[in-house]
């Protein structure tokens, strides 16, 4: 009997021990679940189930491009800091495959910065569009709006198209380039630069990474800005362009830019990722000017980068991430989100870096130029100046640019 009692006591103790272990495990799981819910609150609280967080696929230029991609990642980092949302950055050559994998892994918000939309919007190889396969995932694309049917209606309610009014910012850059080119001898110390003067120097170059709406939108706006000022001043310019520069070969960018500089161009604008680094370096070498893009890169080659046309992807990435956190994706789903000069997501830099090179004698003329730029900006905002927007489907008509020759377009 005593042995039976001992056995029963042992069994009761064992049961209590096991019960305590499982209770401890249960508490641990609850704790882990609560911790993850810092980033994935339930919809009953007014915020969305964020799943694993937000995914972002970079463009070919990669995450360390000092511009387009890096700015977008900064938006995600801000969303993580301010809103508690985790994120994943993917660098890939297989955009459709990565979109599918990420959506399949539970990501409900995916940004894709590469100009590659067919598999997402139309479907390829007999497959349904990825957007249709994953209707509960929002896909955000940039620099074009392919998410429309022939009648203008929206194809997929879970696709967001982000457009920057870089055509307007590029117009400003073109106007600035012409004003500076016409007054270079008054603005700068001749010992610091080797500008080509007179008609021989009334030439400008443009390097684009690809012949796509997301790139031509810069070139066309730039050309129109040059023509606008050239017409006002009664002079004629030549616009050299190459839309096959790619995005990674900086040495090739330097070589191509040098052909423009050697032919008399004083300013070359590059919209081509790392190719622009080569253009900037060549501008410094030959003592002329370049124009950069995406982020404020004026200080990369101080005094040789005239300005940068800004495409601040941080602004829309953070805004959309906040809607995601607030369970308010209905505000953006299926829509085209456009960011103009006033939004802070596009424009040109404040010119403070190049301004340090303006001579004392050139200060009055420089202030006059900045005043002219302000007037032009106001006219764009009011609609008095209309700039071709290739991203929105506007057709570019170079025959309307009476003061600009475009031999390559």
PLM regions with names:
Residues 1-12:
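Bacterial N-terminal signal peptides that target proteins for export
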Residues 15-16:
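Repetitive helical segments and hydrophobic/amphipathic motifs
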